[in-house]
């Protein structure tokens, strides 16, 4: 049978090294952040109660990778030292479990993963789920670090962030100790927590800045050595991938995606060398993929608000104020038989879309006569947004 598949081109030695799931054994260009993390967690290996830690930074700057590296290092160090209690770390992504109740169930089931206990299911009361979580923590008779990735996705219910740090004080655990490690893309996340939760957390903060071009070159050199066959890259490919990613968001993920797609372009053209022209072709592919993936993660009304800005941009009417955009948004919602949200909610969506990189936000101040307000314009390609929303599962536009 004749098939449409090509013979394998030996440009990749190990393509998985350039995939999202790959976790490097050694973390590059994050020594300062690792030192801050070690200082924040030093009490654990010294035998004291751990501090809560919150980690902030944009997507792709190493927050989750460094956190996992530090959890592994901490568990190893605790095992290696005499007189130090065992350390257990458990991670849950709050994007997939966006309420305290769902996150608590997921934590229980992660902790039960290596036991004979049955997993929890929904339907239990909140107090029963919390008691099950405290029981699992107490059963470890050591230090348990609860890692909540994308913690800014937790809804307005602060229950878990209030209960975990107070577990020992409230008598929910006795022979163990627990701390929360929160990872967030949103630097203002803490401000949205209730005052009692802010007072309870008393956390240490670690901020991850975007990578610069030189740091991204180091990271790409390391990945390329493991992922690619010798001599397949022309000299300017890695610097170009690094420069483009640094200029955009400073994301290692973006730089690695550009490198991988550049190699794919060369393979599809049946060439044995990757050039800077291949990088230019890869840029649009990566951007389209990023936009498509990010739009899938938006709520339905988040997509409607983004589409409203996109349509306004196509009409050459941006930057636009939120109150002027609202009518466009309401028409889109009505088109899909959905009741529009309040103007305040739309304003919140606009702020979120700005933080995610879809929009550019302008602060206008015209004094007493004109007032102060924000205007918004699209910061990504309008056609890509339309195509991505058209493909999204929960909004076909």
From Swiss-Prot:
Task: Cite the InterPro entries for this sequence.
Answer: AAA+_ATPase (IPR003593), AAA_16 (IPR041664), Cdc6_C (IPR015163), Cdc6_lid (IPR055237), ORC1/CDC6 (IPR050311), Orc1/Cdc6_arc (IPR014277), P-loop_NTPase (IPR027417), WH-like_DNA-bd_sf (IPR036388)
- Protein name as annotated: ORC1-type DNA replication protein 8
Q: Kindly list the GO molecular function terms attached to this UniProt entry.
A: ATP binding; ATP hydrolysis activity
SMART domains (alphabetical): AAA, Cdc6_C
> Gene name, please?
orc8
Any one biological process term the GO annotation gives? DNA replication
Task: Recite the UniProt keywords alphabetically.
Answer: ATP-binding, DNA replication, Nucleotide-binding
Family stated for the protein in its record: Belongs to the CDC6/cdc18 family.
Q: What does this protein do?
A: Involved in regulation of DNA replication.
């Amino acid at each position: 049978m004749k098939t449409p598949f090509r013979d394998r081109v030996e440009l990749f030695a190990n393509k998985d090294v350039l995939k999202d799931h790959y976790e490097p054994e050694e973390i590059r260009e994050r020594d300062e952040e690792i030192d801050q993390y070690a200082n924040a967690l030093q009490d654990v290996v010294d035998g004291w109660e751990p501090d809560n830690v919150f980690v902030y930074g944009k997507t792709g700057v190493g927050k989750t990778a460094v956190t996992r590296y530090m959890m592994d290092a901490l568990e190893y160090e605790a095992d290696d030292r005499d007189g130090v209690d065992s350390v257990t770390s458990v991670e849950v992504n709050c994007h997939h479990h966006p309420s305290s109740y769902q996150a608590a169930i997921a934590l229980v089931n992660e902790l039960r993963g290596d036991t004979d206990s049955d997993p929890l299911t929904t339907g239990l009361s909140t107090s029963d789920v919390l008691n099950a979580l405290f029981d699992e923590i107490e059963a470890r008779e050591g230090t348990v670090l609860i890692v909540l990735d994308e913690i800014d996705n937790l809804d307005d219910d602060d229950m878990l962030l209030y209960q975990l740090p107070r577990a020992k004080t409230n008598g929910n655990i006795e022979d163990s100790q627990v701390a929360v490690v929160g990872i967030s893309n949103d630097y203002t996340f803490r401000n949205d927590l209730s005052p009692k939760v802010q007072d309870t957390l008393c956390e240490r903060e670690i901020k991850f800045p975007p990578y610069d071009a030189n740091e991204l070159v180091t990271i790409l050199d390391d990945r390329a050595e493991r992922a690619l066959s010798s001599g397949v890259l022309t000299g300017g490919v890695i610097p170009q991938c690094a420069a483009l990613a640094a200029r955009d968001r400073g994301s290692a993920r973006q730089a690695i995606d550009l490198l991988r797609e550049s190699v794919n372009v060369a393979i599809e053209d049946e060439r044995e060398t990757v050039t800077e022209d291949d990088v230019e072709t890869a840029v649009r592919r990566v951007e389209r993929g990023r936009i498509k993936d990010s739009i899938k993660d938006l709520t339905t009304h988040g997509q409607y608000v983004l589409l409203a800005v996109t349509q306004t941009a196509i009409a050459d009417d941006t930057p636009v104020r939120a109150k002027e955009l609202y009518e466009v948004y309401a028409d889109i919602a009505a088109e899909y038989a959905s009741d529009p949200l309040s103007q305040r909610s739309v304003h919140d969506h606009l702020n979120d879309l700005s933080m995610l990189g879809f929009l550019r936000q302008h602060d206008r101040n015209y004094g007493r006569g004109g007032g102060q307000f924000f205007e918004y314009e699209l910061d990504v390609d309008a056609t890509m947004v339309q195509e991505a929303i058209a493909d999204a599962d929960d909004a076909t536009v």
